[in-house]
């Protein structure tokens, strides 16, 4: 009997650790994305001198991967959900990091669609 209770205690500790880690990661992602979202509008206006129409077009293109999210997730069905989410977060991080290097509006479109693919992969998991 003690063997079962030891095993259950270890499982409970691992589960608690995983939930704490998950909570911390969700907080960090949410905080970082909130900072990005608030700075992005100013970056478009002040650095890239984008018009409201340009912003609307960019936002429209950014949502295309969202429409294709089920198809993207379906192609990765052989992977575990946690791996797909990790891939999505990595793509999002690289894309958002590359946003600051966009010297003009045209590269920004590609970068935004790129990180949107990762974000929508993550969000579907």
Regions found by a protein language model. Give the residues of each.
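Helix-loop boundary and gating motifs at the non-cytosolic
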Residues: 6-66, 107-109, 114, 123
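Hydrophobic alpha-helical transmembrane segments of polytopic
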Residues: 22, 85-88, 92
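Generic alpha-helical transmembrane segments of integral inner-membrane proteins
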Residues: 31, 64, 68-71, 90, ...
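Membrane-embedded alpha-helical segments of multi-pass transporters/permeases
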Residues: 38, 71, 97-101, 124
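Membrane-helix boundary and inter-helical linker elements of multi-pass secondary transporters
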Residues: 48, 77-79, 100-101
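Helix-to-loop junctions at the C-terminal end of transmembrane segments
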Residues: 68-82
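C-terminal ends and interior cores of transmembrane alpha-helices
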Residues: 90-104, 109
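Cytoplasmic helix-loop-helix junction between adjacent transmembrane helices
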Residues: 119-125
């Amino acid at each position: 009997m003690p063997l079962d209770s030891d095993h259950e205690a270890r499982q409970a500790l691992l589960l608690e650790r995983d939930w704490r880690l998950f909570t911390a990661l969700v907080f960090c992602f949410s905080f970082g994305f909130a900072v990005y979202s608030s700075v992005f509008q100013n970056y478009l206006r002040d650095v890239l001198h984008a018009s409201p129409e340009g912003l609307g077009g960019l936002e429209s293109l950014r949502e295309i991967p969202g429409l294709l999210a089920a198809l993207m997730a379906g192609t990765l069905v052989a992977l575990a959900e946690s791996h797909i989410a990790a891939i999505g977060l990595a793509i999002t991080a690289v894309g958002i990091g590359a946003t600051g290097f966009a010297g003009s509006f045209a590269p920004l479109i590609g970068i935004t669609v790129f990180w949107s693919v990762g974000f929508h992969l993550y969000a579907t998991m």
